[in-house]
């Protein structure tokens, strides 16, 4: 890790890992301050299907969402995802990367990482997003 990596926030570091692991996808980083609640990433998979990913980094079980983020995912439950990187200690052989469907944001806000993810680990997440239609 160079100078930049040392000074990147945890979400920026996670985004770099996502970029590395999702090389076959087109990733568009949405830096959107005008529309609150807009997800972090617009993703186009190899079949030309789009989805969005909200990037979250969590030190504990809880995942924090703004009311705008919750509203966005309730309004757009399909092909929206929340990708979480757990920074805290995890059981052995557990991936630290989790993918959740946007339609489950209310449960995710309530239960945090206790909620079952639809995919764990970069490879499983990539396959899940590859098979969108």
Residue ranges of model-derived segments:
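Acidic-basic catalytic patches of nuclease active cores, encompassing PD-(D/E)XK
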Residues: 2-32, 46
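Conserved catalytic cores of phosphodiester-cleaving nucleases, focusing on short active-site segments
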Residues: 41-43, 49-59
């Amino acid at each position: 890790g160079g100078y930049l990596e040392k000074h990147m926030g945890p979400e920026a570091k996670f985004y770099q890992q996502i970029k590395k692991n999702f090389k076959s996808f087109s990733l568009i980083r949405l830096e959107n301050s005008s529309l609150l609640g807009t997800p972090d990433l617009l993703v186009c998979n190899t079949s030309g299907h789009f989805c969005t990913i909200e990037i979250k980094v969590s030190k504990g079980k809880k995942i924090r969402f703004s009311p705008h983020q919750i509203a966005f995912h309730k309004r757009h439950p399909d092909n929206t995802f929340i990708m979480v990187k757990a920074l805290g200690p995890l059981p052995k052989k557990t991936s630290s990367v989790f993918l959740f469907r946007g339609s489950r944001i209310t449960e995710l806000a309530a239960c945090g990482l206790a909620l079952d993810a639809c995919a764990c680990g970069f490879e499983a997440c990539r396959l899940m997003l590859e098979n969108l239609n």
